[in-house]
Amino acid sequence: MSPQTETKAGVGFKAGVKEYKLTYYTPEYETKDTDILAAFRVTPQPGVPPEERGAAVAAESSTGTWTTVWTDGLTSLDRYKGRCYHIEPVPGEEEQFIAYVAYPLDLFEEGSVTNMFTSIVGNVFGFKALRALRLEDLRIPVAYVKTFQGPPHGIQVERDKLNKYGRPLLGCTIKPKLGLSAKNYGRAVYECLRGGLDFTKDDENVNSQPFMRWRDRFLFCAEAIYKSQAETGEIKGHYLNATAGTCEEMIKRAVFARELGVPIVMHDYLTGGFTANTTLSHYCRDNGLLLHIHRAMHAVIDRQKNHGMHFRVLAKALRMSGGDHIHSGTVVGKLEGERDITLGFVDLLRDDYIEKDRSRGIYFTQDWVSLPGVLPVASRGIHVWHMPALTEIFGDDSVLQFGGGTLGHPWGNAPGAVANRVALEACVKARNEGRDLASEGGEIIREACKWSP
């Protein structure tokens, strides 16, 4: 393909500022199977036509800059530029529109979520011609998906490792999150696992503080795991948070966890960064460790409706970077989410092929070509009375993570864990018998209470 007309040698270089839409707005463009497609919610400054703003987003997130430069003539912009190929209004929002942008695959390094985000969202969000900008969704082409390892193991391999089938997995975040000594922390882990939980969890900000250094915590938690396994006959785990200040230190902690023989480690993937996360994910696959992912800091990025990035994009990025679990919201509890929207990105985490469905916030059909799935984790503000709804909404392939809903039991940690396990098994049994969890959930839990703490 030839460069732009303005930069052909026969015409000569012409300096100056020109409208973005002359080069980057191409409504006639037919997207390719290899293009990365993006849907941006754009709120422009007053008086700026949508075509110009959509083209500006495409330009500033690909090959463009604020003026014409002579080096444009040394490459083919038609081959490498991003293109705004469609614009549609946002219902009920007169000042907003959705700009669809296609990016050629050659703009991105293979297997690098870091590079993908640096290109697409790294600079354009500070563009002063826009009042606000939000990345709503991405379509990752099959050709790019195949350059990623994805989750270290995936849903089926995890179930096989744990020998647990036919129900959601149960977890608990140890509280108080900060201040416990390593020995007392390990005691709480043991009580919860002995009571019937599958996992316990470090909170996201438990790393290696003066009151509890990481090595001590790992040792006491491993002791709790082995002791509870011996008593219950079930495989247990604790999400040992390997997040650290450097990648080298993070891997050192993961290596120690592997040497202890525990099944799973944890990473804060947004604060730790995608490069660190992908590094840890590769280590976990090579060494048989499951990887639990916490999304600490996500609300800084995804909470605003008009600016930032929707969590479904972060969820897709995590599936590419690698993680076997990720916190996904609850739909119920203290951090309630929109049910259809939440289930939309839950499906993007678990399923192999997801059709476009705007009612669930899915802007593009996504084919993961057998990339392993990720278990969504429902957590924060949930308790046993939410169990029927959680079982119905999330299904078997999920982790139900209780903190205060376990440790807040008036009889202590172990009875709290027993109550969680009894409630879950009662709901699963009732569902399998054909009972309606939505209408009979309260009755099912009350029946289970007769034989449970």
From Swiss-Prot:
A molecular function GO annotation: ribulose-bisphosphate carboxylase activity
Modified residues (N-acetylproline): 3
Biological role stated in the UniProt entry: RuBisCO catalyzes two reactions: the carboxylation of D-ribulose 1,5-bisphosphate, the primary event in carbon dioxide fixation, as well as the oxidative fragmentation of the pentose substrate in the photorespiration process. Both reactions occur simultaneously and in competition at the same active site.
UniProt xrefs under InterPro entries: RuBisCO, RuBisCo_large_chain_AS, RuBisCO_lsu_C, RuBisCO_lsu_C_sf, RuBisCO_lsu_fd_N, RuBisCO_lsu_N_sf, RuBisCO_lsuI
SUPFAM superfamilies to which the protein is assigned, alphabetical: RuBisCo, C-terminal domain (SSF51649), RuBisCO, large subunit, small (N-terminal) domain (SSF54966)
One family name in Pfam for this protein: RuBisCO_large
Binding-site list for substrate: 123, 173, 177, 295, 327, 379
Top-level division of the source organism's lineage: Eukaryota
Residue positions, PTM N6-carboxylysine: 201
Swiss-Prot/TrEMBL keywords: Acetylation, Calvin cycle, Carbon dioxide fixation, Chloroplast, Disulfide bond, Lyase, Magnesium, Metal-binding, Methylation, Monooxygenase, Oxidoreductase, Photorespiration, Photosynthesis, Plastid
Species of origin: Galium parisiense
Residues marked Transition state stabilizer (site): 334
Enzyme Commission identifier(s): 4.1.1.39
Further comment: The basic functional RuBisCO is composed of a large chain homodimer in a 'head-to-tail' conformation. In form I RuBisCO this homodimer is arranged in a barrel-like tetramer with the small subunits forming a tetrameric 'cap' on each end of the 'barrel'.
GO-annotated cellular components: chloroplast
Stated family: Belongs to the RuBisCO large chain family. Type I subfamily.
Cofactor descriptive note: Binds 1 Mg(2+) ion per subunit.
Name recorded for this polypeptide: Ribulose bisphosphate carboxylase large chain
